[in-house]
């Protein structure tokens, strides 16, 4: 399945060769990573696109969910996210310029100079990776409270190394039973072993369904 005909020009930040846009579009539309979860969508629930980047997943899911909340802390990527939503006349996605983490407040944020897509609260293991900005953070239970979220059918979690900390946190435990399914990406370079993420998910009532591809995308569903 290729991107739909009504997918218009995509705004992105940086050089095309430094981005994973082609890979991401193939993953979403051709490989259909999110397609198996569409039948699980329950009326009145929302989707959370955490680490929305330029909004490709939000664009895809906007056709199926009544409401999507998209978090993206990077200034440049957030600008592109907004432009892509406006350019495609998407009105059911709420973009929020924050990072999801285990505590709120401002924190240093950065990444390697040759990869404009890779931005993280963690220092990646590349020689030139450095923090070059400060971003506002929010915990997941505070996000639920602020946005009055009752139920999440799908949580997309791509937080560049913070996934284990988030899923292991007390704030996640407080809302875990309101989440039906998680599609996320593992980042072993954060210093966490993959089994720590698996254990945290299981402790919060999720079962690991499968690893989807070589990008270490995982699927976890509520037991």
Predicted segment positions?
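Phosphate/nucleotide-binding beta-alpha loop and adjacent structural elements of enzyme active sites
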Residues: 1-223
